[in-house]
A protein has these predicted regions:
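A short, flexible low-complexity segment enriched in Lys/Arg and Gly/Pro that occurs
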Residues: 68, 76, 119-120
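Short, ordered, surface-exposed loop/turn motifs in non-cytosolic proteins
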Residues: 74-98
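Conserved "repeat-terminator" motif of extracellular CCP/Sushi domains
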Residues: 20-65, 70-71, 154-181
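Acidic, serine/threonine/proline-rich low-complexity intrinsically disordered regions
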Residues: 80, 97, 105, 130-133
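Surface-exposed interfaces of beta-sheet-rich extracellular modules
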Residues: 1-27, 107-157
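Acidic/polar residues at beta-strand termini and the immediately following turn/coil
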Residues: 72, 93-100, 104-105, 113, ...
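Conserved beta-strand and immediately adjacent loop positions that scaffold enzyme active sites
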Residues: 2, 67, 100, 108, ...
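Short loop/beta submotifs within extracellular cysteine-rich repeat domains
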Residues: 11-14, 43-47, 73-79, 145-148, ...
């Protein structure tokens, strides 16, 4: 019977029942009772921790990239691209009995609602920098050319921000020529 609980996502914490030992009914009722303490088994999602089943998994890592390309009107490269990237890593806890994410308190215990049911949690994404945002970029100055965007504003980034490519196009400035006879 205990294996059914373990297969359902619980883990054995303690027991006064000695597994593998033969027990027989006793007239002393106390000898017929055993205390087995089970708790919900948890899966810790931490792709940076070698002990986590998520270790090294790309499913829990997202990288958001912004590339600013500098081109002439004909599409050829005018200046080296500016690339910025921010990496996000997901963390969470899954209750093996339900297969759902749960919330833990500061002591590592599952937080429950007024009906003693676990409060459903989610993955928490953390950026590899304190303030996840792309920096403002001033377009390079090219002699004889004008950029259609003199700068690209900075923007906040989340794990759900799509990658983006911004194209800055340089147009040749009009030139005056004086012809002398």
């Amino acid at each position: 019977v205990l294996n059914l609980f373990i297969e359902s996502g619980y883990k054995l914490v303690s027991s006064d029942y000695e597994f593998g030992k033969d027990y027989y009914y006793s007239a002393d009722e106390a000898k017929n009772n055993f205390t087995i303490h089970l708790t919900r088994d948890l899966i810790i999602i931490d792709p940076t921790n070698p002990d986590s089943p998520a270790y090294g998994s790309e499913d829990y890592i997202k990288e958001v990239i912004q590339e600013i390309q500098y081109v002439f009107e004909n599409g050829s490269t005018a200046a080296e691209s500016n690339k910025q990237n921010i990496k996000f890593t997901a963390y969470g806890v899954v209750d093996k009995t339900t297969g759902k994410y749960v919330v833990l308190d500061e002591n590592g215990k599952i937080v429950v609602d007024e009906n003693k049911q676990p409060i459903e949690g989610t993955l928490t994404w953390k950026a590899d920098i304190t303030d996840p945002k792309f920096a403002e970029v001033i377009s390079p100055t090219l002699a004889g050319y004008t950029a259609d965007k003199t700068w690209v504003s900075g923007s906040s980034v989340t794990e759900n921000t799509p990658n983006k490519v911004i194209v800055v196009t340089y147009t040749a400035n009009a030139a005056n020529a004086e012809i002398i006879y």
